[in-house]
Design a protein with these regions (language model features):
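Extracytoplasmic/periplasmic substrate-recognition and gating elements
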Residues: 33, 41-46, 50, 81-145, ...
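Extracytoplasmic/secreted proteins, especially bacterial periplasmic and envelope-associated proteins
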Residues: 1, 31-41, 57, 75, ...
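Extracytoplasmic/periplasmic solute-binding protein
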Residues: 1-24, 67
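Paired acidic/hydrophobic, glycine-rich loop segments that form the ligand-binding mouth/hinge
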Residues: 68-73, 88
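Short, flexible turn/loop "capping" segments at secondary-structure junctions
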Residues: 14-16, 102-106, 186
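Short helix-initiation/N-cap motifs at beta->coil->alpha
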Residues: 49-64
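Glycine-centered hinge/linker elements that transmit conformational signals in sensory
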Residues: 15-51
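Conserved C-terminal helix/tail region of periplasmic/extracytoplasmic solute-binding proteins
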Residues: 171-212
Length: 212
């Protein structure tokens, strides 16, 4: 989200045909430096991220009412409701000096038909039925799933959670769906984690390492 705010529309650039090019990373260079500096500032300048806090600690503190806000997704809402947390959904503000709004990576769940199925036609028809607006509304009401169908969102527009996420989603970018994404996750995480752990960490070196 922070990398997108500072200019990286995705992890990878696109080629002339509009396909993701795994040889061209967008999260390094000046974009990476600014994003990492902001993350570092959250910890050491603004003191908004306490020392030693990871997702588990932050999530637990939010459920206990000891944390004012958390960056999270629809998957966490069930636990928050069980903990009786009075919460709302809102886009993260644009970081200082950012050229774009903050935006998360987006992913969707789908229905997959087995290529070896003996009843492909019936399976496809069933899959199409599952993703109709009416059934997506039913999935939301039964399990809190956030629909991507505009017609379903329209039907649920009075639901504050659905309404909140519907304002966040347009700001996001699709999660890269190429195999090379998995190879970036580890080094990216290893390179960015120290920004909130060490006040002397060189944020200019990390983006260079990502591009190496």
């Amino acid at each position: 989200g922070f990398f997108k705010a500072f200019g990286a529309e995705n992890v990878f650039a696109k080629d002339a045909k509009g396909n993701l090019d795994p040889t061209k990373l967008l999260i390094g260079g000046e974009v990476g430096e600014k994003a990492l500096q902001f993350i570092k500032d959250l910890r050491f300048k603004y003191n908004l991220v306490p020392e030693g806090v990871d997702y588990g600690v932050a999530d637990g503190a939010f459920k206990d009412g000891a944390l004012a806000m958390i960056l999270n997704g629809p998957w966490a809402l069930g636990d928050y409701k069980k903990a009786k947390v009075d919460f709302g959904i809102a886009p993260f503000p644009a970081p200082p000096g950012a050229k774009n709004p903050w935006g998360p990576f987006l992913g969707v769940q789908g229905v997959v038909v087995n290529a070896y199925s003996k009843n492909k036609t019936q399976a496809v028809n069933f899959a199409k039925t599952l993703v109709t607006g009416r059934n997506l509304v039913a999935f939301n009401q039964a399990g809190g799933r956030i629909p991507v169908s505009k017609s379903a969102v329209k039907q649920l527009e009075k639901d504050p959670v659905v309404a909140g996420f519907s304002k966040v989603f347009p700001l996001g970018a699709p999660m890269p769906n190429i195999p090379e994404t998995a190879k970036v996750r580890g080094p990216w995480g290893n390179a960015t984690s120290p920004t909130s752990q060490r006040p002397d960490y060189n944020v200019k070196k990390t983006p260079t390492d990502l591009l190496a």
